[in-house]
């Protein structure tokens, strides 16, 4: 019934966070919960072919990929992945203090903005998913999981 794009961080298992068993949801995991063509194809399959009714992009606090992007880490293939997070860093203007991975308020805000950016990318890059959403056949929403409290905040930008 649901497709969840979440991070590879072991603390962010969608099955555990949402109390779902194996086979209950489509779980797509990638560092920084970023979107690429393979992930879009997986979401299109889960919704158009398998009948999933909701896509949730699930970010989380204290995300190592977000922290690495905030710290401008450049290493191998990781560099390209972190570049997809950079627009969220540039959009974050609310947090005072250091604009790096040591400022956890900054990191949390970037995590939320990254989810918002990924939601926009889904709608812009997949005409299939955008059409299904426009027709009311699926919902595309964002969520942020707080590692410390276990709370999940849902939102639609």
Across the structure, where does each feature detected by a protein language model lie?
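Divalent-metal-activated hydrolytic enzyme cores
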Residues: 23, 32-50, 64-157
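Divalent metal-coordination and catalytic microenvironments
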Residues: 4, 28, 57, 142, ...
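Gly/Ser/Thr-rich loops at beta-strand to alpha-helix junctions
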Residues: 8-11, 61-65
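Short, conserved "active-site rim" segments that organize catalytic pockets and cofactor/ligand binding
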Residues: 1-34
């Amino acid at each position: 019934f649901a497709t969840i794009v979440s991070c590879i961080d072991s603390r962010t298992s969608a099955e555990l966070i949402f109390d779902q068993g194996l086979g209950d949801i489509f779980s797509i995991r990638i560092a920084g919960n970023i979107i690429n063509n393979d992930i879009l194809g997986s979401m299109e399959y889960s919704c158009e072919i398998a009948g999933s009714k909701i896509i949730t992009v699930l970010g989380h606090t204290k995300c190592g990929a977000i922290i690495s992007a905030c710290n401008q880490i450049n290493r191998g293939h990781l560099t390209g992945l972190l570049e997809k997070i950079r627009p969220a860093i540039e959009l974050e203007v609310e947090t005072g203090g250091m604009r790096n991975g040591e400022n956890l308020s900054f990191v949390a805000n970037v995590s939320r903005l990254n989810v918002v950016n990924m939601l926009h990318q889904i709608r812009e890059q997949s005409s299939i998913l955008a059409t299904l959403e426009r027709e009311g056949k699926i919902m595309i929403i964002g969520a942020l999981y707080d590692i410390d409290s276990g709370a999940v905040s849902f939102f639609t930008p």
